């Protein structure tokens, strides 16, 4: 499966649009990470625990989006975008979305 943030794939031609595909995950914070985040916010610096959590969540969202594209018989996903939002206090959602397409063979 090819997936890209661009609207085209160099060297490939889109034969058919299979529709919008999405993948999302809601990730909650861990109390230990919250304590470290509080300390980091005082002294400054990257909060590695949250960075790792969001990277993992993004990977899961992409995986779910790719699974949906496979179910639609797509060869690729173009125009991928990501959004994040706070769902409830202590949790965040990452949504990945794009257009599933069939490529000319």
UniProtKB/Swiss-Prot annotation:
InterPro entries (UniProt xref):
UPF0145_dom_sf (IPR035439), UPF0145_YbjQ-like (IPR002765)
Q: Note one Pfam family from the annotation.
A: YbjQ_1
List the SUPFAM superfamilies: YbjQ-like
Positions of disulphide bridges: none
- Report the superkingdom from the record: Bacteria
Q: Family membership, please give it.
A: Belongs to the UPF0145 family.
Alphabetical list of HAMAP family matching this protein: UPF0145
The entry's protein name is: UPF0145 protein VP1283
Question: Which organism is the protein's source?
Answer: Vibrio parahaemolyticus serotype O3:K6 (strain RIMD 2210633)
């Amino acid at each position: 499966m090819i997936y890209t943030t661009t609207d085209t794939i160099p060297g490939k031609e889109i034969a058919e649009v299979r529709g919008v595909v999405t993948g999302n995950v809601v990730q909650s914070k861990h109390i230990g990470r919250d304590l470290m985040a509080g300390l980091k916010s005082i002294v400054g610096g990257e909060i590695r625990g949250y960075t790792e959590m969001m990277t993992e969540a993004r990977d899961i969202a992409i995986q779910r989006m790719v699974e949906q594209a496979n179910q639609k018989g797509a060869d690729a996903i173009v125009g991928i975008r990501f959004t994040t939002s706070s769902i409830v206090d202590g949790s965040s959602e990452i949504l990945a979305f794009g257009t599933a397409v069939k490529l000319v063979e």
